[in-house]
A protein has these predicted regions:
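Sequence-specific dsDNA recognition surfaces
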Residues: 6-60
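Non-catalytic DNA-recognition/assembly elements of restriction-modification systems
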Residues: 1-21, 138-176
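A short glycine-rich beta-alpha junction/loop motif
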Residues: 1, 83-89, 120-153
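Active-site donor-binding loop signature of nucleotide-sugar glycosyltransferases
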Residues: 32, 93, 137
C-alpha cells in the first residue's frame, strides 16, 4: 500500500477573519514586502497602510504566504497574532491537523512550482486560490503530521539561528 494523498483543502483553510488596522501594531503587520524571499521568514514592515482598512487577522501558528510573485517563496510560520495585507494568504490548519505539518508542506519547492503552474498574470503573477487548495500532500495521522512538522520546524529554527550568527560575524568582520 503506497502513500495516500489528500488535497490541501482537506487539512487547511484560508483565514478570512478581519482585524481593524487601528488594532495592529507595526511589529505585527505583515505585507508581501515584509515577507522575505527564499523562505527566510519576515522582517518588520516599513509602515502601516496610510488609510483605515481591515486586515486579515492571523494568529500564532498560522502560515502566511505572499501571493504576489510566488516564485520568490515568501513564507512565515506566525509566532504572534497580527494583521496581514490582502496580498498575503493566511492558512490555518483544520481541527485534527498539525499547523507545523501545514507549514512543512507549504515550505516545499514543489508547492511553489505548483502555484506557478496556475498563476494569473505575467508581470506580477499571483497564485490562483482555488488551485492552491487542490495541492496534493500526504494523508497522515495527526501524530505523524506533528512529528514531521516539529522536525521541520526545528530545522528551520536552527537555520535561522545560524543565519543570525553569520550576519553578526559578517558585521564584526567589517569592523576590523
Amino acid at each position: 500500500m503506497g502513500l495516500q494523498l489528500c488535497q490541501l483543502c482537506e487539512i487547511a483553510y484560508f483565514v478570512t477573519d478581519k482585524i481593524p488596522l487601528e488594532n495592529v501594531l507595526l511589529t505585527d503587520y505583515v505585507t508581501t514586502d515584509s515577507l522575505l524571499p527564499n523562505k527566510e521568514g519576515r522582517c518588520v514592515a516599513q509602515n502601516l497602510p496610510p488609510q483605515k482598512c481591515a486586515l486579515t487577522h492571523f494568529k500564532c501558528g498560522d502560515v502566511l504566504v505572499a501571493n504576489i510573485r510566488p516564485y520568490l517563496k515568501k513564507i512565515w510560520f506566525a509566532d504572534r497574532e497580527g494583521g496581514a495585507s490582502a496580498d498575503v494568504l493566511v492558512f490555518r490548519a483544520k481541527s485534527g491537523h498539525s499547523q507545523e505539518f501545514l507549514y512543512a508542506s507549504l515550505l516545499q519547492d514543489s508547492f511553489y512550482d505548483y502555484v506557478m503552474k496556475g498563476k494569473k498574470g505575467s508581470k506580477m503573477p499571483r497564485g490562483d486560490k482555488a488551485q492552491i487548495m487542490r495541492y496534493s500532500i500526504p494523508k497522515l495521522s495527526l501524530s505523524e503530521e506533528a512529528c514531521i512538522g516539529n522536525i521541520i520546524l526545528s530545522f528551520c529554527t536552527k537555520i535561522n539561528v545560524n543565519r543570525r550568527i553569520n550576519d553578526n560575524l559578517e558585521a564584526m568582520a567589517k569592523q576590523l
